[in-house]
Swiss-Prot record:
Species of the source: Homo sapiens (Human)
Variant or mutagenesis effect after changing F788L: In HYPOC1; induces a significant shift to the left relative to the wild-type protein in the MAPK response to increasing extracellular calcium concentrations and
Subcellular location, principal: membrane
Intracellular loop 1 (ICL1): region residues: 637-648
Arginine-rich retention motif: annotated segments: 890-898
Consequence the record notes for mutating E297K: In HHC1; decreased G-protein coupled receptor signaling pathway
Region (Cysteine-rich (CR)): 542-612
Consequence the record notes for mutating P136L: In HYPOC1; increased G-protein coupled receptor signaling pathway; does not affect cell membrane localization
Residue ranges that the UniProt entry lists as topological domain Cytoplasmic: 637-648, 699-722, 790-805, 855-1078
Biased composition (Low complexity): 900-918, 932-960
Protein name: Extracellular calcium-sensing receptor
Length: 1078
């Protein structure tokens, strides 16, 4: 009695608890029973349970043709195994398959049925009854589909270690073996799928997406893993929403508004088709287009979403699909289904009715109930499922499945169906291992084997964990330690078929889980059709891409993906799009105009090839040529008076120094090297000091001689050539010492200056010591200042005495140039520093060359008549007479004042300003050299009393004159000189006698004081000039003239053979001087 009571309790638990009727299952007896859980319907009808009566099981609605095909795949695999002699011979597999209706509650009802039929040791029911012979055990379960459903089922089956092999549940939570002890699956883990989604977004350079997930154990873990992967790739999520097929309208409206207001174009969805369908319907109703949907494998090929009327919203969807498999003979098996023939499949009747939209009457042989009315059914908006009640015609039973397009018959890509097929074969191979196990080699204690006829579920689970077999496609099948079967994904794109207008899934790439990171994803972009039938990759970024040359700048308060593009600063670059930072260019490089790369900095110096450098070089060469030309002219005409009058040896040295000055400017042109930097400043400084020293010595020599009170041979000897060269050497040696100290202590060197301008490297000379450079230039300016002082002081001396006036001008030019050089040098940089110094050198050099030598070259080449000894004598005598005239006038003024003080008449005082004018007549023949000077000075009365002889008259008529007119304000002094050939006769002896008598007299006339200097400028004759003053009070006397010692350096004396007349008029008095030489 107890035995029967126990059996009835278990049967009640099995049948009444599950509340499944005969037409809500597919079952077949066998030696070993396999359980199956499939979503034959998408959901259940909402029904209020007020508990006023016994609660009934909820009704399943919205038929799932794919779910029925998956069920058919399990039946096909079992029948194929039963008919195979190689696998489980002499054993028959049976099945019990239930509809989960895609809900946890229905799945648990079916699971309780599986559990109740097993021997439950934990309940200790064996003491009361043994029903195992009457109710066969379910040793494994295939299913379920959704991860949420499988999670609930796994929790229950895991309590009894009943193996569960899922074909579509990919949640990564199910890999936890501590919680789900008996769960295995033939589908990859969602962890790889989430990574693949992030890789696709990174591939298309999207960084601004939205996420939607099903509010279950599939959607939440999947989207969480995606967030982790997105964060690693700097992908920002604009919004994240949870949905469910049971969400109320308000929740759906909220999610739709979020999508509509979002700027993200790409939406990642981890959900199943039934959970996503209400949201898609509302989006279609609002006509929200332009979004790119990234679908997980749970809905990537869902018939609920992939409907033509939704294509304008979901067209272009990129989704993941499991790798398609091949099931030989499965196509024909699907076509054989018929409600009257498929006696073991209780779902065939409803399938037939939903396929042909008709109503089947129960036949005599069929198990179908007899209904006297036409059934209505809720359908899901299409011909197979709608929300309205419609009356259906009777089915004839002769309908052809091939004539109707349904997802059931779409076997082109067998993905989930193949996973079901593989799950059944996995269990079969585990049973085969038990069947073929040899004692001692088993997996159990002491190598024992399980008895195939009394096999238990936990034993099958043990063998499934160690399963390893080759499937019909030649692939190795094995479960890892987490019970997962690692596999690859196909990437599909939703297209609209041009033939029938249905949505087709085009394979556009794949994702290889086994490949290395970065090589897992392959996409053929040419095959992708985006939303709106566009071939262009859509833009889904919070900010536009920052092009090369810019970097991403953070916007405060915004996600990291929302940024502004900031141009790279000068000296930095970015050569990639969306660079997070700019790279700094190397030291000798600078960023280009677009900051996309680094280019070598421009090297800048005063080059030989640039126009400015060429111009300066030409001027320097011109200066060298002109200086060489002047030197050549001076050498060629070295014996002419004008060359001799300029102290030709010093002139040669001066011209050589000018050549050095012009040449030194060339060291400042070209790329600076260490040796040129060390050479150019000393070369410039020494050359200019040598030049100025020559001018200084020449000018000072003349000044000292003219200022001497009693010029004697001491002055001539002191200012000899040797001493002059010695002074030039000493002045130059000081500059050499400065340069040597400079080069020894802090030598200049070439320097690459990158601080002045960012884009240019200025190759300049680092002077080493600015103090040394200051000493060099300061010493040069000091000598120039002294030279200018002496030249200015001697500016009124005779022109032929080194042209002091022109030297003054040259020194003025020199100072103007170098004073202008200082601010210009200080305010310029780079190559212009060298250019300024070159210009200063050339300007100063040209000034010295032009002022000192060009006038002489002009006279030598174009006015040879002035390049005579007579012209030199005239100039010298003119200066002497001007000095004498001043002295005479001063004495006249003194006598007048003295007479006025004694009561005499007074006259006006002449002005102190004096001007002179000289006129030279025909050139004189050059006199022969005289060894003895024979001047003669006669008084005015003697000149009038002594008659002239005929030769003297002729000579007086022919001899040339040099006239001078001196103006003293209100007074005028006019004098004239004439020169004649010296005669070695009695007349010369008589003149000598008169000269001796005149030398005995004491005279203070200034003319006599300058007389010894006359030979310094005269070429080859001696000069004898005596002026006797009459009509003036006071004694008349003169100093004795020293002898000429050096005939080459000192010119011979002149013989004055005509009268010298001075007319001095001042106020009411006139002073006349006549000097007659014959």
């Amino acid at each position: 009695m107890a035995f029967y009571s126990c059996c009835w309790v278990l049967l009640a638990l099995t049948w009444h608890t599950s509340a499944y009727g005969p037409d809500q299952r597919a079952q077949k007896k066998g030696d070993i029973i396999l359980g199956g859980l499939f979503p034959i319907h998408f959901g259940v009808a909402a029904k209020d349970q007020d508990l006023k009566s016994r609660p009934e099981s909820v009704e399943c609605i919205r038929y799932n043709f794919r779910g029925f095909r998956w069920l058919q795949a399990m039946i096909f695999a079992i029948e194929e195994i039963n008919s195979s002699p190689a696998l489980l011979p002499n054993l028959t597999l049976g099945y019990r398959i239930f509809d989960t209706c895609n809900t946890v509650s229905k799945a648990l009802e079916a699971t309780l049925s599986f559990v109740a039929q097993n021997k439950i040791d934990s309940l200790n029911l064996d003491e009361f009854c043994n029903c195992s012979e009457h109710i066969p055990s379910t040793i494994a379960v295939v299913g379920a589909t959704g991860s949420g459903v499988s999670t609930a089922v796994a929790n229950l089956l895991g309590l009894f270690y009943i193996p569960q092999v899922s074909y579509a549940s990919s949640s990564r939570l199910l890999s936890n073996k501590n919680q789900f002890k008996s769960f295995l699956r033939t589908i990859p883990n969602d962890e790889h799928q989430a990574t693949a989604m992030a890789d696709i977004i990174e591939y298309f350079r999207w960084n601004w997406v939205g996420t939607i997930a099903a509010d279950d154990d599939y959607g939440r873990p999947g989207i969480e893993k995606f967030r982790e992967e997105a964060e690693e790739r700097d992908i920002c999520i604009d919004f994240s929403e949870l949905i469910s097929q049971y969400s109320d309208e308000e929740e759906i409206q909220h999610v739709v508004e979020v999508i509509q207001n979002s700027t993200a174009k790409v939406i990642v969805v981890f959900s199943s088709g039934p959970d996503l369908e209400p949201l898609i319907k509302e989006i279609v109703r609002r006509n929200i287009t332009g979004k790119i949907w990234l679908a997980s494998e749970a809905w990537a090929s869902s018939s609920l979403i992939a409907m033509p009327q939704y294509f304008h919203v979901v067209g272009g969807t990129i989704g993941f699909a499991l790798k398609a498999g091949q099931i030989p003979g499965f196509r024909e098996f699907l076509k054989k289904v018929h409600p009257r023939k498929s006696v073991h499949n209780g779902f065939a009747k409803e399938f037939w009715e939903e396929t042909f939209n008709c109503h089947l009457q129960e036949g005599a042989k069929g198990p179908l109930p007899v209904d006297t009315f036409l059934r209505g059914h809720e359908e899901s908006g299409d011909r197979f499922s709608n929300s309205s009640t419609a009356f259906r015609p009777l089915c004839t039973g002769d309908e052809n499945i091939s004539s109707v397009e349904t997802p059931y018959i779409d076997y082109t890509h067998l993905r989930i169906s193949y996973n079901v097929y593989l799950a059944v074969y996995s269990i079969a191979h585990a049973l085969q291992d038990i069947y073929t196990c040899l004692p001692g080699r088993g997996l159990f204690t002491n190598g024992s084997c399980a008895d195939i006829k009394k096999v238990e579920a936990w034993q099958v689970l043990k063998h499934l964990r160690h399963l390893n077999f080759t499937n019909n496609m030649g692939e190795q099948v094995t479960f890892d330690e987490c019970g997962d079967l690692v596999g690859n994904y196909s990437i599909i794109n939703w297209h609209l078929s041009p033939e029938d207008g249905s949505i087709v899934f085009k394979e556009v790439g794949y994702y290889n889980v086994y490949a290395k990171k970065g090589e897992r994803l392959f996409i053929n972009e040419e095959k992708i059709l985006w939303s709106g039938f566009s071939r262009e990759v859509p833009f889904s970024n919070c900010s536009r891409d920052c092009l090369a040359g810019t970097r991403k700048g953070i916007i405060e308060g915004e996600p990291t993906c929302c940024f502004e593009c900031v141009e790279c600063p000068d000296g930095e670059y970015s050569d990639e799009t969306d660079a997070s930072a700019c790279n700094k260019c190397p030291d000798d490089f600078w960023s280009n105009e677009n900051h996309t790369s680094c280019i070598a900095k421009e090297i800048e110096f005063l080059s030989w090839t640039e126009p400015f450098g060429i111009a300066l070089t030409l001027f320097a060469v011109l200066g060298i040529f002109l200086t060489a030309f002047v030197l050549g002219v001076f050498i060629k005409f070295r014996n002419t008076p004008i060359v001799k009058a300029t102290n030709r040896e010093l002139s040669y040295l001066l011209l050589f120094s000018l050549l050095c000055c012009f040449s030194s400017s060339l060291f400042f042109i070209g790329e600076p090297q260490d040796w040129t930097c060390r050479l150019r400043q000393p070369a410039f400084g020494i050359s200019f000091v040598l030049c100025i020293s020559c001018i200084l010595v020449k000018t000072n020599r003349v000044l000292l001689v003219f200022e001497a009170k009693i010029p004697t041979s001491f002055h001539r000897k002191w200012w000899g050539l040797n001493l002059q060269f010695l002074l030039v050497f000493l002045c130059t040696f000081m500059q050499i010492v400065i340069c040597v100290i400079w080069l020894y202590t802090a030598p200049p060197s070439s320097y690459r200056n990158q601080e002045l301008e960012d884009e240019i490297i200025f190759i300049t000379c680092h002077e080493g010591s600015l103090m040394a450079l200051g000493f060099l230039i300061g010493y040069t300016c000091l000598l120039a200042a002294i030279c200018f002082f002496f030249a200015f002081k001697s500016r009124k001396l005779p022109e032929n005495f080194n042209e002091a006036k022109f030297i003054t001008f040259s020194m003025l030019i020199f100072f103007i140039v170098w004073i202008s050089f200082i601010p210009a040098y200080a305010s310029t940089y780079g190559k212009f520093v060298s250019a300024v110094e070159v210009i200063a050198i050339l300007a100063a050099s040209f000034g010295l060359l032009a002022c000192i030598f060009f006038n002489k070259i002009y006279i030598i080449l174009f006015k040879p008549s002035r390049n005579t000894i007579e012209e030199v004598r005239c100039s010298t005598a003119a200066h002497a007479f001007k000095v004498a005239a001043r002295a005479t006038l001063r004495r006249s003024n003194v006598s007048r004042k003295r007479s006025s003080s004694l009561g005499g008449s007074t006259g006006s005082t002449p002005s102190s300003s004096i001007s002179s004018k000289s006129n030279s007549e025909d050139p004189f023949p050059q006199p022969e050299r005289q060894k003895q000077q024979q001047p003669l000075a006669l008084t005015q009365q003697e000149q009038q009393q002594q008659p002239l002889t005929l030769p003297q008259q002729q000579r007086s008529q022919q001899q040339p004159r040099c006239k001078q007119k001196v103006i003293f304000g209100s007074g005028t002094v006019t004098f004239s000189l004439s020169f004649d050939e010296p005669q070695k006769n009695a007349m010369a002896h008589r003149n000598s006698t008169h000269q001796n008598s005149l030398e005995a007299q004491k005279s203070s006339d200034t003319l006599t004081r300058h007389e010894p200097l006359l030979p310094l400028q005269c070429g080859e004759t001696d000069l004898d000039l005596t002026v006797q003053e009459t009509g003036l009070q006071g004694p008349v006397g003169g100093d004795q003239r020293p002898e000429v010692e050096d005939p080459e350096e000192l010119s011979p004396a002149l013989v004055v053979s005509s009268s010298q007349s001075f007319v001095i008029s001042g106020g009411g008095s006139t002073v006349t001087e006549n000097v007659v030489n014959s």
